[in-house]
From Swiss-Prot:
Residue ranges of the motif TXY: 180-182
Keyword Nucleus: yes
Gene Ontology CC terms, in alphabetical order: cytoplasm; cytosol; glutamatergic synapse; mitochondrion; nucleus; spindle pole
Domain Protein kinase: 24-308
Gene: Mapk14
Protein name (record): Mitogen-activated protein kinase 14
Modified residues (Phosphothreonine): T16, T180
Regulation: Activated by cell stresses such as DNA damage, heat shock, osmotic shock, anisomycin and sodium arsenite, as well as pro-inflammatory stimuli such as bacterial lipopolysaccharide (LPS) and interleukin-1. Activation occurs through dual phosphorylation of Thr-180 and Tyr-182 by either of two dual specificity kinases, MAP2K3/MKK3 or MAP2K6/MKK6, and potentially also MAP2K4/MKK4, as well as by TAB1-mediated autophosphorylation.
Domain notes for this protein: The TXY motif contains the threonine and tyrosine residues whose phosphorylation activates the MAP kinases.
Protein family (similarity comment): Belongs to the protein kinase superfamily. CMGC Ser/Thr protein kinase family. MAP kinase subfamily.
Active site: D150
Originating species: Rattus norvegicus
């Protein structure tokens, strides 16, 4: 929020009162979820259309308050072409005592990868460019020691020039309920995170990229499981059942016992599964869709794979500034999280206008 307080105006949209600076005009609702509602708006200062998100009850509980602080800290930190960043953050409150609402402003992204896959069969060159950009964004995110956790086509925004941004970090851990049944939330999830096998690492995101890449190449969801067990069966049918080395790493005894009860299956030949695909694409998929997360390719390694030869530029694949997430282990009260969040709102410095390059 800029230093001198702007003039705000109030408007009711979908039974929610929005109180925003005059800079943002023509608000129109575009969606809402558990954690907030989003409006498209015209930013009179830049001439661009933006997305304004009003967080829902940001401080109603300690969990909400910490989530609000986490989302703001993450968005403020992200400064990369392939990752959604923060254009503005504001509150109508004039003081910490009045502070109850948080609004976040980001680029308005037109389509997501879901829309793109449904509409057209993609060429191999399209797939190269899209997956390259996801990995370029992931290298940046992972370098800050952040894991997205929820990469899927609907969390990848693409404009008409095929430029891509990663959205919606896995800020809130999904509940068991949201992961149950025939749901996309789970189809792109690495087995170790879906089934709580073990402590997971950044390569959970690489598994998701493999699932997305396979879908772009074939036009079909790779592992559309109807439930957790069906999902695991679909995965093991492709990549084979785990060997002794991986079984030893699975800390959950019940998961280990269940896997050992299944019939042994060999890994399929990916070239026979992805018929007609570029052999380099198939080779990369084999390195991403590895059951043992310790042996999965990293984002930085994947960028150097021959499949991306025409896009890879080691001097233009930046890493992030260090990100201090020591707050994650803190047990603060609501008012303490609220005060920390207020400080982050007040201290926000908007990006230079020429960085707002991506209009969709």
């Amino acid at each position: 929020m800029s230093q001198e307080r702007p003039t705000f105006y109030r408007q009711e949209l979908n039974k929610t009162v929005w109180e925003v600076p005059e800079r943002y005009q023509n608000l129109s609702p575009v969606g809402s979820g558990a954690y907030g509602s989003v409006c498209a708006a015209f930013d009179t200062k830049t001439g661009h259309r933006v997305a304004v998100k009003k967080l829902s009850r940001p401080f109603q509980s300690i969990i909400h308050a910490k989530r609000t602080y986490r989302e703001l800290r993450l968005l403020k930190h992200m400064k990369h072409e392939n990752v959604i960043g923060l254009l503005d953050v504001f509150t109508p409150a004039r003081s910490l005592e009045e502070f109850n609402d948080v609004y976040l402003v980001t680029h308005l992204m037109g389509a997501d990868l879901n829309n793109i896959v449904k509409c057209q069969k993609l060429t191999d060159d399209h797939v190269q460019f899209l997956i390259y950009q996801i990995l370029r964004g992931l290298k940046y995110i992972h370098s800050a020691d952040i894991i997205h956790r929820d990469l899927k086509p609907s969390n990848l925004a693409v404009n008409e020039d095929c430029e891509l941004k990663i959205l919606d970090f896995g800020l809130a851990r999904h509940t068991d309920d949201e992961m149950t049944g025939y749901v996309a939330t789970r189809w792109y999830r690495a087995p170790e995170i879906m089934l709580n096998w073990m402590h997971y690492n950044q390569t959970v995101d690489i598994w998701s990229v493999g699932c997305i890449m396979a879908e772009l190449l074939t036009g079909r969801t790779l592992f559309p499981g109807t439930d957790h067990i069906d999902q695991l069966k679909l995965i093991l049918r492709l990549v084979g059942t785990p060997g002794a080395e991986l079984l030893k790493k699975i800390s959950s005894e019940s998961a280990r016992n269940y896997i050992q009860s299944l019939a042994q299956m060999p890994k399929m030949n990916f070239a026979n599964v992805f018929i007609g695909a570029n052999p380099l694409a198939v080779d990369l998929l084999e390195k991403m869709l590895v059951l043992d997360s310790d042996k999965r390719i990293t984002a930085a390694q994947a960028l150097a794979h021959a499949y991306f030869a025409q896009y890879h530029d080691p001097d233009d694949e930046p890493v992030a500034e260090p990100y201090d997430q020591s707050f994650e282990s803190r047990d603060f009260l609501i008012d303490e999280w609220k005060s920390l969040t207020y400080d982050e709102v007040i201290s926000f410095v908007p990006p230079p206008l020429d960085q707002e390059e991506m209009e969709s």
